[in-house]
């Protein structure tokens, strides 16, 4: 069970993946403190409506919340500067990479970044797998 684990979901653009992740994580780890940070307000609002405990927007919110998180979840682009059509700044990518948190990255092949060796799967399967991994990590942490 995810008791008091701090799970941070980061997404950008329209927040569609983040919304799905938040919804799945809220079901898988109902006791987790689920924070959503969007690179823009549209993404943040989508994740908040999906069940995040709280949401914030922007570079500083990513940096601050990465320091506080036990687990960070999002598309693989959150560790690549200039990914998500330029929404991920170098400071955001560095904050995710340098965080002491465990990272669960969803392999989305978009924006000129490709993950080889991972078969293409529907987003719903990737989201379910990510939620399961976070649940396992939360059980190990808690």
PLM region spans:
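A short helix->loop->beta-strand "cap" motif at the edges of active sites that frequently abuts
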Residues: 31-32, 98-103
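Glycine-rich phosphate-binding loop
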Residues: 54-92
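Fold-independent oxyanion-binding glycine-rich loops
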Residues: 10-13, 37-40, 58-60, 75-77, ...
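Glycine-rich phosphate/diphosphate-binding loop of Rossmann-like nucleotide-binding domains
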Residues: 6-41
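N-terminal beta-loop-helix "entrance" segment that forms/cooperates
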Residues: 35-57, 113-116
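Short, glycine-/small-residue-rich phosphate/pyrophosphate-handling segment
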Residues: 105-142
């Amino acid at each position: 069970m995810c008791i008091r684990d701090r799970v941070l979901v980061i997404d950008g653009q329209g927040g569609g993946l983040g919304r799905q992740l938040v919804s799945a994580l809220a079901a898988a780890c109902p006791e987790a403190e689920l924070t959503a940070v969007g690179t823009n307000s549209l993404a943040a609002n989508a994740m908040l409506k999906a069940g995040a405990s709280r949401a914030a927007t922007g570079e500083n919110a990513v940096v601050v919340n990465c320091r506080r998180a036990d687990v960070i979840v999002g598309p693989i682009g959150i560790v690549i500067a200039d990914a998500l059509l330029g929404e991920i700044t170098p400071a955001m990518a560095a904050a995710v990479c340098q965080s002491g948190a465990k990272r669960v990255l969803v392999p989305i092949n978009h924006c000129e970044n490709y993950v080889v060796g991972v078969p293409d799967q529907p987003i719903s399967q990737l989201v379910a797998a990510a939620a399961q991994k976070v649940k396992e990590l939360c059980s190990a942490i808690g």
